[in-house]
Amino acid sequence: MKKTQTWIITCIYLQLLLFNPLVKTQEICRNPVTDNVKDITKLVANLPNDYMITLNYVAGMDVLPSHCWLRDMVTHLSVSLTTLLDKFSNISEGLSNYSIIDKLGKIVDDLVACMEENAPKNVKESLKKPETRNFTPEEFFSIFNRSIDAFKDFMVASDTSDCVLSSTLGPEKDSRVSVTKPFMLPPVAASSLRNDSSSSNRKAAKSPEDPGLQWTAMALPALISLVIGFAFGALYWKKKQSSLTRAVENIQINEEDNEISMLQQKEREFQEV
């Protein structure tokens, strides 16, 4: 009985061992953007217009492909949001400044984790370092929303294009973020975050986050581990049945031998009489 339990436990752990790493990998890069980004409008309204938020701004954000600056930008956004969070007290519930910033920080942290797992390869990066600047809440969260919007295209972005700023790009063209338009949440804060625009729909077939591909990738190792578990169970059952059959045969042989011995003993006693 103990051996049977041992085999069952072994099969279960084998399935978990094969299945769990893939699930973990899939979870890291699922879309981390939630409806919490809709609260940015309220947060910007709560902060003074002259309140300055420090951010290491990645040069070339306005002229380079998103995969060139997105990884560094979300990392710097995470640092700035953490610093901003420390300036508020967690004393109120609901949509307080603290809770909004905390939720936005968690979104960015998930983006950072995904960037680390899927860093572009063979990319010639610019040697220009990020510049530390101060932004108003309106400017800062415009950059935040733009970074989230760029994340949608990150998985299908080119891994080979260079990320070097052109020599004709002067510091005047990249020294500030354009905020000539009134602050508005881009479509990313609403419908674009979930079931996106036509451009993302065109890329869905190639995207590694296609639901069909995800389920296939998750089901395949689970099926393999299940088959292996049943195979081990079948082998053990066959071995157990063989042992039981031999044991029954041995018992029957012993009983027959005992009966023969008893008959022979009675026959000798009868002859003696």
UniProtKB/Swiss-Prot annotation:
Residues 26-214 are extracellular. Residues 1-25 form the signal peptide. It holds the Pfam family SCF. One of its GO terms (cellular component) is plasma membrane. It comes from the Eukaryota. The modification Pyrrolidone carboxylic acid is found at residue 26. GO terms for molecular function: cytokine activity; growth factor activity; stem cell factor receptor binding. Residues 190-211 are annotated as: Disordered. GO terms for biological process: apoptotic process; cell adhesion; cell population proliferation; ectopic germ cell programmed cell death; embryonic hemopoiesis; extrinsic apoptotic signaling pathway in absence of ligand; hematopoietic progenitor cell differentiation; male gonad development. Disulfide bonds join 29-114, 68-163. A soluble form is produced by proteolytic processing of isoform 1 in the extracellular domain. InterPro entries: 4_helix_cytokine-like_core (IPR009079), SCF (IPR003452). Residues 238-273 are cytoplasmic. The chain crosses the membrane at residues 215-237. The record marks 97 as: Not glycosylated. Glycans are attached at residues 90, 145, 167-168, 180, 195. Coiled coil: none annotated. Keywords: Cell adhesion, Cell membrane, Cell projection, Cytoplasm, Cytoskeleton, Disulfide bond, Glycoprotein, Growth factor, Membrane, Pyrrolidone carboxylic acid, Secreted, Signal, Transmembrane, Transmembrane helix. Residues 191-202 have a biased composition (Low complexity). Belongs to the SCF family. Ligand for the receptor-type protein-tyrosine kinase KIT. Plays an essential role in the regulation of cell survival and proliferation, hematopoiesis, stem cell maintenance, gametogenesis, mast cell development, migration and function, and in melanogenesis. KITLG/SCF binding can activate several signaling pathways. Promotes phosphorylation of PIK3R1, the regulatory subunit of phosphatidylinositol 3-kinase, and subsequent activation of the kinase AKT1. KITLG/SCF and KIT also transmit signals via GRB2 and activation of RAS, RAF1 and the MAP kinases MAPK1/ERK2 and/or MAPK3/ERK1. Homodimer, non-covalently linked. Heterotetramer with KIT, binding two KIT molecules; thereby mediates KIT dimerization and subsequent activation by autophosphorylation. PANTHER family: KIT LIGAND. This is Kit ligand.
